[in-house]
């Protein structure tokens, strides 16, 4: 009998709901990337686990932020490097950005970033040498692989176990998105990654955009040489990066058209920008006190991301000087040496609740490195930005926000205290910046489904249907000349030329018959009269 006060059908409905949930539960292999990439991916993984799926996450034993969780199974990968090695390679890369910003992909990946990527690639080799782990993964009979393609290993695992895959990324290096998803990317109006161009390019910029694409095709195979060698060794057959990317079932990107410029998409591409945004939580007593003490001037939130903890002393002092010139209270997440000229209005903290502070009514501006997480938290909370991009897609993100009139971009190498002061005063006092960011916030929030729910749906979709082959374009099966219809153009051109040739020959023959014969008759007639 149903409990008193409850509808008789309620327990039955609950049982049916739970039964259907368990019936749909599956097994998911997750191959993430460390750092800020993991923060948003973890949200999806945890929700999938809460929905009853058996989730297994493979992570290296040495990492910054990835660790054990009670919500899903973690398999540790034994690696040769230590945490000190990881920190050394990343700090070497990050510190170089304060000396000379490596804007182009060639310089970024070939120089300071090369050692860091080689370290990541080595993790994949270690994984396949762990026969016990590989056998466990093989026997687990997963329904799909949810992966970050940054280090390529997830793609190799998906191909090795012949599993459908869902890619989760902020963007794909090189031209492999064009080839892997067969997604058109016309260089005439789709800026290449790291180019800092907009979708409205001058002739000179379009030339450089085309050259960037050509450089990608020439250089990227060299950069991913180690990854391809590992894949070929593991799969026991020669493969290319295109071979690894082509089988992807769903491409999931941490962006949307509020940030991204309008461009072509494929049916298996999903935009989930702002997945890290959430309703601001009440501040702790410490931060609430800081905010309340700011008075009518409000606060400015300053963070260069979780991966940048130190700034060269001279640059830190320039920044501190600029911050001391504005009336707002500055909350600066910084773990480096305290600048000697730090003003009273600037508070250094080792950690801050960034989203919660940006969601406070007293937030006036946001100084950010333009990472996708920070950019979207700024958009969601409607806070204008002063952007100081350092590397990677941060340059492109800053350009997009600046183009939309929602912030000001500064070159961290060349900026002075005056530049930072003026930029802050501009975004705080010029109402257009606040109006523009509020408009973007309104556009971003006006959607039929939350990004997190959309991401979970598509992962489960691939698990249920063992992939999404009906969304795979036939372009994957065409050769390059078939894709561009060069064979059709050649065939039609041959027909046209043949017809023109026949018509020409026919006309020439007719002319000879008509006019050539009359000439001979007249000539013969004249000779007789003489």
Curated annotation (Swiss-Prot):
One annotated GO molecular function: glucuronosyltransferase activity
Alphabetical UniProt keywords: Endoplasmic reticulum, Glycoprotein, Glycosyltransferase, Lipid metabolism, Membrane, Signal, Transferase, Transmembrane, Transmembrane helix
CDD domains with a match to the protein in the record: GT1_Gtf-like
Catalytic activity: glucuronate acceptor + UDP-alpha-D-glucuronate = acceptor beta-D-glucuronoside + UDP + H(+); 17beta-estradiol + UDP-alpha-D-glucuronate = 17beta-estradiol 3-O-(beta-D-glucuronate) + UDP + H(+); 17alpha-estradiol + UDP-alpha-D-glucuronate = 17alpha-estradiol 3-O-(beta-D-glucuronate) + UDP + H(+); estrone + UDP-alpha-D-glucuronate = estrone 3-O-(beta-D-glucuronate) + UDP + H(+)
Group of enzyme by EC: transferase
Keyword Cytoplasm carried by entry: no
Glycan-bearing residues: 71, 292, 430
InterPro entries on file: UDP-glycosyltransferase, UDP_glucos_trans, UDP_glycos_trans_CS
One GO-annotated biological process of the protein: liver development
Membrane topology: Single-pass membrane protein
Residue spans crossing the bilayer: 488-504
Signal peptide: 1-25
Main location: endoplasmic reticulum
Quaternary structure and interacting proteins, as annotated: Homodimers. Homooligomer. Interacts with UGT1A1, UGT1A3, UGT1A4, UGT1A6, UGT1A7, UGT1A8, UGT1A9 and UGT1A10 to form heterodimers.
Protein name per UniProt: UDP-glucuronosyltransferase 1A8
Gene source species: Rattus norvegicus (Rat)
């Amino acid at each position: 009998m149903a409990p008193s006060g409850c509808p008789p059908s309620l327990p039955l409905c609950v049982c049916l709901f739970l039964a259907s949930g368990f019936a749909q539960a599956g097994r998911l292999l997750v191959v993430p990337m460390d750092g800020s990439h993991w923060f948003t991916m973890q949200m999806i993984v945890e929700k999938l686990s809460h929905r009853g799926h058996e989730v297994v996450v493979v992570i290296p034993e040495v990492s910054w932020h990835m660790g054990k969780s009670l919500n899903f199974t973690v398999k540790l990968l034994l690696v040769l490097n230590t945490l000190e090695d990881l920190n050394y390679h990343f700090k070497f890369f990050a510190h170089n950005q304060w000396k000379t910003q490596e804007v182009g992909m060639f310089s970024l990946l070939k120089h300071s970033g090369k050692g860091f990527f080689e370290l990541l690639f080595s993790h994949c080799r270690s994984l396949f040498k762990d026969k016990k782990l590989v056998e466990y993964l093989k026997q687990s009979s997963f329904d799909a692989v949810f992966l970050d393609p940054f280090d390529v290993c997830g793609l190799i695992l998906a191909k090795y176990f012949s599993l459908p895959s869902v890619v989760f990324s902020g963007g794909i290096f090189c031209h492999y998105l064009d080839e892997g998803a067969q997604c058109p990317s016309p260089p005439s109006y789709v800026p290449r990654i790291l180019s800092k161009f907009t979708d409205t390019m001058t002739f000179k910029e379009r030339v450089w955009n085309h050259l960037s694409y050509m450089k990608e095709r020439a250089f990227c195979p060299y950069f991913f040489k180690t990854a391809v060698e590992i894949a070929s060794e593991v799969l026991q057959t020669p493969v290319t990066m295109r071979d690894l990317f082509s089988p992807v079932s769903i491409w999931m990107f941490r962006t949307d058209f509020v940030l991204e410029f309008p461009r072509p998409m494929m049916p298996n591409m999903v935009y989930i920008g702002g997945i890290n945004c959430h309703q601001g939580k009440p501040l702790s007593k410490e931060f609430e006190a800081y905010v309340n003490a700011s008075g009518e001037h409000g606060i400015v939130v300053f963070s260069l991301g979780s991966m940048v903890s130190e700034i060269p002393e001279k640059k830190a002092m320039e920044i501190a000087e600029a911050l001391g010139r504005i009336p707002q209270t500055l909350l600066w997440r910084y773990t480096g040496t305290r600048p000697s000229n730090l003003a009273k209005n600037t508070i250094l903290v080792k950690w801050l609740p960034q989203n919660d502070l940006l969601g406070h009514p007293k937030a006036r501006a946001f100084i950010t490195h333009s990472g996708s997480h920070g950019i979207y938290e700024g958009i969601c909370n409607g806070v204008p930005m002063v952007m100081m991009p350092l590397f990677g897609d941060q340059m492109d993100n800053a350009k997009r926000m600046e183009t939309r009139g929602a912030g000001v971009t500064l070159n961290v190498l060349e900026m002075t205290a005056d530049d930072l002061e003026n930029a802050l005063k501009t975004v705080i006092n010029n109402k257009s910046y606040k109006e523009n960011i509020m408009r973007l916030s309104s556009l971003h929030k006006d959607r039929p489904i939350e990004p997190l729910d959309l991401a979970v749906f598509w992962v489960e979709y691939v698990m249920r249907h063992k992939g999404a082959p009906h969304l795979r374009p036939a372009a994957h099966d065409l050769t390059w000349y078939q894709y561009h219809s060069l064979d059709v153009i050649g065939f039609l051109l041959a027909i046209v030329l043949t017809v023109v040739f026949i018509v020409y020959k026919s006309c020439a023959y007719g002319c000879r018959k008509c006019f050539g014969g009359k000439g001979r008759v007249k000539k013969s007639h004249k000779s007789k009269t003489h």
